[in-house]
């Protein structure tokens, strides 16, 4: 099959790669859509050697083959794929039995991701989508799950005033997650006009310019002078700017949920969140939702 690889020089190249072969509990999925995550771009920029396996973890496709112990009726199903969690989890360690497959201590070896014509994952990590869901939408299921998990890690409560830092894919899906989980007001910071418009279309109440020096003052005005009950950080990167903003924009005894991937060690003033008695939660990928 054809697959795309980061070549270690900041470029992606297409070349031949062996077709995946299913194990007993696996499914082979013909890839129909793969999203490009910000983490893919950050890792590509950091690489100095070519990848041996294709990346890509926001994937939707059609099951075309299954292993010996998988129900054959799954063939032909349209699915979104949990590439990192159940798709590779052992299902027997303490974390798997607790429903936290992303934290599996016996994770199967990487098999390659969705920047390829086909991908192999455990069948239990494939979630059926209906015929009215487009392939592009199927690739958004994974980042939406990331945002739902992050909002839950931040203990979002009904009526909360929520600030979302960043309006990329994770920030935009965090708008949907926060609204569906009962947020009373959702304020998002966006760098580009088209991001702000999309955030408002998805349900954000207010979109602010992330580069404005007045953003902090505006957030205070919009939150009755207190600050956000919960701030969801979705940017990450190589400097602590959005971490500093998260502390600034969040009220005393408020909560911060960090979804963004920070790629280098950072210097950060921990005294400020300590004095404000803020709770800081880190969130990686996704877990079960209400036991499902």
Give the positions of each predicted feature.
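Glycine-rich beta-strand-centered segment in the early N-terminal region that forms part
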Residues: 20-34, 47-92, 130-132
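Adenosine-phosphate binding glycine-rich loop
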Residues: 258, 277-292
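Glycine-rich cofactor phosphate-binding loops and adjacent beta1-alpha1 units
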Residues: 197, 201-279
């Amino acid at each position: 099959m054809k697959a795309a690889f980061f070549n270690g020089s900041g470029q992606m190249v297409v070349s031949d790669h062996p077709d995946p072969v299913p194990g007993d509990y696996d499914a082979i999925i013909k890839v129909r859509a793969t999203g490009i995550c910000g983490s893919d771009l950050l890792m590509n920029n950091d690489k100095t050697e070519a990848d041996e396996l294709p990346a890509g973890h926001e994937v939707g496709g059609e099951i075309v083959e299954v292993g010996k112990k998988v129900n054959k009726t799954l063939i032909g199903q349209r699915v979104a794929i949990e590439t990192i969690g159940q798709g590779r989890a052992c299902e027997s360690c303490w974390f798997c039995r607790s429903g936290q497959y992303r934290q599996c201590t016996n994770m199967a070896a990487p098999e390659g991701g969705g920047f390829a014509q086909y991908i192999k994952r455990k069948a239990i990590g494939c979630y059926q989508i209906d015929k009215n869901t487009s392939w592009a939408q199927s690739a958004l299921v994974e980042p939406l799950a990331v945002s739902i998990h992050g909002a839950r890690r931040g203990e979002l409560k009904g009526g909360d005033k929520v600030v979302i830092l960043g309006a990329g894919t994770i920030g935009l899906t965090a708008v949907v997650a926060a609204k569906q989980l009962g947020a009373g007001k959702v304020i998002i910071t966006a760098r580009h006009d088209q991001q702000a418009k999309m955030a408002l279309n998805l349900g954000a109440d207010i979109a602010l310019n992330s580069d404005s020096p007045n953003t902090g003052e505006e957030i205070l005005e919009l939150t009755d002078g207190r600050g956000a009950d919960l701030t969801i950080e979705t940017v990450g990167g190589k400097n602590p700017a959005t971490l500093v903003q998260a502390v600034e924009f969040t009220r005393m005894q408020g909560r911060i949920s960090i979804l963004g991937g920070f790629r280098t060690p950072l210097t950060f003033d921990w005294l400020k969140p300590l004095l404000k008695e803020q709770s800081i939660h880190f969130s990686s990928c996704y877990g079960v939702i209400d036991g499902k």
